[in-house]
Amino acid sequence: MTEGGLGTAAAACLFPGFYGLGAPDWLKPLLADGLGGVVLFARNVRDPEQVAGLTATLRAEQPALLVAIDEEGGDVTRLEAETGSSFPGNLALGAVDDVALTRRVAAAIGGEVAAVGIDLDLAPVADVLVDPATAIVGVRSFGSDPQLVARHVAAFVEGLQSVGVAACAKHFPGHGETAADSHLELPVADAPLETLRERALPPFAAAAEAGARAMMTAHVRFTALGEEAATIDPAVIGLLRSELGFEGLVMTDALEMEGAGGPGGIGEAAVLALAAGADALCLGADLTPEQVEGTQVAIVEAVEAGRLTEERVHEAARRVGELAAWTSPRPHSDRAAGAEAARRALAVEGDAVVGEGALVVELWPDPTIAAGEARHGLGELLGGETVRLREGDAPPPLDHSRPLVLVLRDAHRHPWQRELVVPAAVVVETGVPAWRPERVRAFVATHGAGRANLQAAAEILIG
């Protein structure tokens, strides 16, 4: 714990994650010192009652605490990580292209996080899917048309915030410009500034116009703007403030990610991000308590050394406090919206009805860090036998007496999946349907692998 107003302001900028179903002891001094927020992950979730108890315990220590979560719907869910999301993700909503339905789904997601005491949803993803090869965006994007993405980002923001949960559009100024994963490296986007204005920025402008209370920066270097990752580049956050007129909270993506920049470690990255204009510093869940506490100390020491102004730290803390004061989460249940959206997002070609008893072969690529390992699949919804294969696994012998269902995931990025497709198969693509197999019995595109998406596909396959 640090002493005095500067230390409290520094604590207000921090949003750490932590392990476990309860509040760890090391977090309590930070809460007492005015910690701004925490970010919950699947590792903090057992069931709604437990999460509600956890958030209540945290706020008993710090009543103004913001509690954030990545609850995007579809492939990225924390509250339903064990079962899969009851709501489809952005690509499915973009495929339907009904902004009223997107608004309704977002309100339903907001209502579910509100019910357990969460008041900041790190959604929607506002990245345009410029490169289908990108693993970090993929089905998390509403699509490849900037105007379509913009109108659905606005609708999602409006839906979330209609139930008093703050939206945080991400990843400014756009992660869809590069195929690299910023969890693992610093991606570089070489598009000219005018191209960014035409292609990447419209969804973020729409989010600002819709009243989004927060925006998250990308750990991507945009050569048209500067030499640093966007999170620590004053030109990038200046663009957000001046050109888009955004006055809300600017939050960083997790600073322990490889793409965050700052060779001096997490504390140095935090100082650089604040100096660049960020307000809230996401620290993820993989840092030690000493690293989190050290980040607060690093901010104070940077001010004392004249590398960061005290006014900047207090300005950031003020924005965190203003967001906390704005939130008023109101529980709201509407899972029917998720089922409707998932059904409408399905694209079916050919005879997809297999009934019960099919052999289901699920081809699973390595998971992304953002989505995590899926714990559910289509096979369990269809009955019969399910075989799950990773790259390099030998396929099972085919039994021509029963139907074959092949479940793919971003086959356009994985040649090994494409090589296993046979003409007799009903092929179900649960990722971005950028590759369409020829001469198969049927092809089904779900536009996502959330439970709602897979349930909709199962209804079609069972008949």
Regions found by a protein language model. Name each.
Residues 36, 119-120, 213-214, 279, ...:
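Short acidic/polar active-site loop segments enriched in Thr and Asp
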Residues 83-97, 141-143:
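A charged helix-plus-loop insertion that forms the helical arch/lid used to bind
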Residues 1-33, 262-463:
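Preference for extracellular/luminal or secreted protein segments
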